[in-house]
Amino acid sequence: MNTKIINKLKEETNNSSYIVYREKYINNIKIDIIYNEVLTDQDKMSNFIYRSLDHIEKIYQEKELLYDVIKNNISNIKIKEINNYQDICKYLNNGFVILLIEDDYSLALEVKKNLTRSIEKPMTETTIRGAMDSFTENIETNIGLIKRRLKTNKLWNEDMELGKYTKNKISILTIKGLTDSKIKDNIINKLNSLEIDGVTDAGTLKHLIENETKTIFPTSITTERPDKVVSSLLRGKTVIIIDNCPFVLIMPVDINDFFLSQDDKDSNYINNSLTRILRYLAFSITVLTPGIYIALTTFNQEMIPLELLTSFASQRSNVPFPAFFEALLMFISFEILRESDYRIPNVSNSALSIVGALILGEAAVNAGIVSPIMIIIVAITAISALVIVEPELSNAIKWYRILFMLGGTTIGIFGIFIVFIIFTTNLCSINSYGKAFTMPFTPIDSDIKNSIIKFPLLKRNKRNKYLTNNIIREVSYEKN
């Protein structure tokens, strides 16, 4: 039987040089040892596996079952029982050593090599006073970072494998009593129904299970911060962790989630309220400003003060393009510059961004391709987009920015209003895993008190009821 298994393995792996086959005899009982040398720790193999087998050879008595003796005498190593050939392949490709014992008994012993990096500072979601740890590519480490913060038995996780070839481990985390079970069950059903060659990152999985495929707005959040995940779980959200991916999915979400930062928890509620208002203002500026400028200079000049209109006209006197193409050219140039900024090493990207923007803007004005006021409009729009906490929302709204520009260049301010109606209608029609994307703004709900305006912590003593049925007090105190 063992010979058939080994021959089948050699055939399927094309007799790979990385798969090592060894034999060991204990009182004339043959043990076949199989492992993948690129995934297993050779020190553990020497110190635990081979040394333990040598010790077992000395103490073994024939009346005992060798299978049980091995399980009882190899310590400090996770041991799994193997029931079929598929288990052998799974454990072999996960850094386990396979022991094929006569009489059809088989064991898998975990001796995997540590191929992951250590816990580091967050790279994409920096905070001033937040936690300084981030997720890694190891799912056990990531779950540990969460459980270290949530010391409760009510933190439940359900594991599954996804991908015909990658067989990635996926863990779905919820807090019993807080999370809406319908959302969790819906996600699990979608994951179970997926038939795909492999999933290697959170972005791919997000698009596979999203309900809203006809909107450019994200209906889930990707994060690398354990503290952000814990805050979301305490609010009744569901979290998906993927092995070999340092980012975690949070769902469902509402539009307000894209304007919240972990630094908000450390700020005074008055200061933080002003900051949140500033973020929403920046959101409005980055979406509307180019379109309004184009509408005013193209169709509705009477709405501009005379001195300002004269200044605009003198600046644009040598520009051969309409305001729409002028703005579009600058935004395309900015997007190209930003994309190149992402693709080059960190030591060079800041210099390239600054020098590129200065040279490009000055050269464009001197050449008469764009006006100085357009450079200012594009700069304000781009800087305002950076204020938005979640970059996924910034990427989504740039398409609506172009629509507002088209509306402004065709029928002026009236076109801006038409696109605005389309924009708000689209937002109100989106749902994130069964929850309204625009809650608590539409419909208006009492939970709005922790959206744009942040109330004192003791006034925010209930959870969002559109996320969970358990709205018991989160924080309270008794006055003496």
Positions of predicted regions on the chain:
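Generic detector of multi-pass transmembrane helix bundles and their immediately adjacent loops
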Residues: 292, 305-308, 320-480
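Short aromatic-rich membrane-water interface segments that cap or initiate transmembrane helices
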Residues: 272, 311-322
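Membrane-embedded alpha-helical signal segments
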Residues: 1-288, 292, 302, 306, ...
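Conserved helix-loop functional segments at active or binding sites
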Residues: 283, 287, 297, 314, ...
